[in-house]
């Protein structure tokens, strides 16, 4: 966590990895994609085996853990269809300099990967991607759900070229996410 001052106001920035965010959400009862952090290929394979035992999955998503978005486009998120591919992909990703639109020009070194349950590729065929994010609307100080059927790894391009395909739903903190909002999001997705 970093603290800095801007115009006599203390500003705190919290950077957490995907796996840490999922742990926080899960601690509040939110269902999240199951995943296990690994620091090396041996741990990655052990994590994949554990996921198979716990969830029955036989495909895995190997995800670089750095403080930046765009990891998939930069080669930091890959699908592994077996344990040999988990080894191969984790060897490629751990230690790499991952360069994305949100990293410095030299990129960021990947020290950990998240071996995640295959929640996106059921069976033998790939499904379509979509994008859903909960973020803070700084103008209003409220949480906002941003989503698109055209998202996934290419959300930055969608925002640049077809912004009308990105939808938002602001959440009133006094009431939380309302049923009508959830239905609207589900309908649009």
Question: Which residues fall in each region the model found?
Answer:
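Short, Lys/Arg-enriched N-terminal segments with co-localized hydrophobic residues
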Residues: 1-13
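ATP-grasp fold ATP-binding core
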Residues: 18-26, 55-72, 100-123, 132
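Structural motif
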Residues: 30, 36, 58-61, 76-77, ...
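Glycine-rich phosphate-binding loop of ATP-grasp-fold ATP-dependent ligases
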Residues: 33-35, 62-89, 131, 155, ...
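Active-site cofactor/substrate anionic-group-binding motifs, chiefly glycine-
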Residues: 52-61, 79-100, 151-153, 163
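Hydrophobic alpha-helical hairpins/lids featuring a short glycine-rich hinge
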Residues: 104-173
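Glycine-rich, mobile lid/loop segments that gate access to catalytic sites or pores
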Residues: 170-189
């Amino acid at each position: 966590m970093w603290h800095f001052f801007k115009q006599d106001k203390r500003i705190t920035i919290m950077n957490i990895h995907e796996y840490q965010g999922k742990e926080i959400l899960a601690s509040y009862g939110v269902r999240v994609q199951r995943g296990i952090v690994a620091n090396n290929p041996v741990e990655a394979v052990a994590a994949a085996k554990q996921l198979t035992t716990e969830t029955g999955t036989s495909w895995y998503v190997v995800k670089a853990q750095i403080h930046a978005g765009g990891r998939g486009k930069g080669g930091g998120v890959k699908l592994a269809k077996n344990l040999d591919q988990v080894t191969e992909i984790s060897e490629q990703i751990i230690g790499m300099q991952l360069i994305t639109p949100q990293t410095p020009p030299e990129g960021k070194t990947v020290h950990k990967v998240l071996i995640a349950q295959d929640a996106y590729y059921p069976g033998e065929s790939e499904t379509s991607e979509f994008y859903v994010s909960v973020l803070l609307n700084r103008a209003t100080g409220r949480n906002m759900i941003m989503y698109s059927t055209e998202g996934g790894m290419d959300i930055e391009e969608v925002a640049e070229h077809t912004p009308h395909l990105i939808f938002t739903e602001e959440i009133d903190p006094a009431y939380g996410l309302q049923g009508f909002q959830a239905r609207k999001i589900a309908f649009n997705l």
